[in-house]
A protein has these predicted regions:
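Helix-to-loop junction immediately C-terminal to a conserved catalytic motif
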Residues: 60
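Conserved ABC ATPase "signature" region
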Residues: 76, 125-144
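ABC ATPase NBD coupling module
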Residues: 77-93, 125, 199
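Conserved ABC ATPase signature
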Residues: 148-152, 156
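Hydrophobic anchor residue at the start of the ABC signature
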Residues: 162
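Conserved catalytic motifs of ABC-family nucleotide-binding domains
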Residues: 169
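Catalytic Walker B motif of ABC-type/P-loop ATPase nucleotide-binding domains
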Residues: 173-176
Length: 242
C-alpha cells in the first residue's frame, strides 16, 4: 500500500476579472507539506475556496504543482504518470462533482466504462461483471444495474459513484464532497461504508464541509485556510467512541 508525500507544494491559478487589482494569479495551495501513510483515513476540512479540491487534485495527479513535488511511495507522481499513466492512475479511486455519473448510461454501463479504463485488470467480461455485482453489493445498491441516474435519489447516486471508484480495487480513495446535499441518514451511511472500506486497508482521503460529523468520526483532520495547512490532528479511531 502506497504512502503519499507532498513537499513544499504550491499550485497557482490564473486570476479572473474579479480578483484584486493587479493580481495575475490566485493561490490554490501554498507551501504544503503533508504525508499520508497507507491505511490512513484523512478528512480535509476548510471553507469554500480554501484549497481542499486543489489539494485532492494534486494528491491524485489530476493537477500538477507549480512548485514542489508530490511523491507516491517515494517516487515523483508526475513522472510516474508520464511513464505509466494507466497503472499509476488506477492507484486512485475518485468521487467528485467532476466525475458525476453519465446520465444517459445505466448504472451497469457507468461501472463498465470505469472498469474498462483498467485495461488488463479483468480477463473477461464475466469477471468484470462479477466485480460490478460485488462493489454494488458492498455499497448496498444490489439490483440497480439497469437503472439510470435520473431514476435514483442523490444518496443512491453517491453510493453508485463510490462503487464506481472501487471498481478497479484502488488502494487510495479520493473523495471530494461525497456527502454534499445529503441528509443526516445518508451522510452516516456513507461514513459507515468508508469506515468499513478503510478497515480493509484502503487509504481514504475525503474533503468535506461536514465538520460536525468529522469530530464524531475521530479520525485524522487536516484543516486548510487560504491555501495553507492550518492544522493536522489525529483524533483517534471511530470505533473508540461507538
Amino acid at each position: 500500500m502506497p504512502t503519499i508525500s507532498l513537499e513544499n507544494v504550491t499550485k497557482y491559478y490564473k486570476a479572473n476579472k474579479h480578483s484584486r487589482a493587479g493580481r495575475t494569479v490566485e493561490i490554490g495551495v501554498e507551501e504544503v507539506n503533508l504525508t499520508i501513510e497507507q491505511g490512513d483515513f484523512v478528512f480535509v476540512t476548510g471553507s469554500s475556496g480554501a484549497g481542499k479540491s486543489t489539494l485532492l487534485g494534486l494528491i491524485s495527479g489530476q493537477l500538477k504543482p507549480d512548485r514542489g513535488t508530490v511523491y507516491l511511495d517515494g517516487k515523483d507522481l508526475s513522472k510516474l504518470l508520464r511513464w505509466n499513466y494507466n497503472r499509476t492512475a488506477l492507484m486512485f479511486g475518485k468521487v467528485s462533482p467532476e466525475y458525476a455519473l453519465i446520465r444517459k448510461l445505466t448504472v451497469e454501463e457507468n461501472l463498465s466504462l470505469a472498469a474498462r479504463v483498467g485495461r488488463g485488470k479483468f480477463e473477461s467480461n464475466r469477471e468484470m461483471h462479477a466485480r460490478i455485482q460485488k462493489v454494488l453489493g458492498l455499497v448496498g445498491m444490489t439490483g440497480v444495474e439497469k437503472k439510470h441516474p435520473v431514476e435514483m435519489s442523490i444518496g443512491e447516486c453517491r453510493r453508485v459513484e463510490l462503487a464506481r471508484a472501487l471498481i478497479n480495487s484502488p488502494p487510495i480513495l479520493i473523495l471530494d464532497e461525497i456527502t454534499a446535499s445529503l441528509d443526516d441518514d445518508n451522510i452516516w451511511d456513507i461514513f459507515h461504508l468508508l469506515t468499513e472500506i478503510n478497515h480493509k486497508g484502503s487509504t481514504v482521503i475525503m474533503a468535506t464541509h461536514a465538520s460536525q460529523y468529522v469530530n464524531i468520526m475521530r479520525r485524522r483532520v487536516v484543516t486548510i485556510v487560504d491555501g495553507k495547512i492550518f492544522g493536522d490532528v489525529r483524533q483517534g479511531r471511530y470505533g473508540d467512541v461507538m
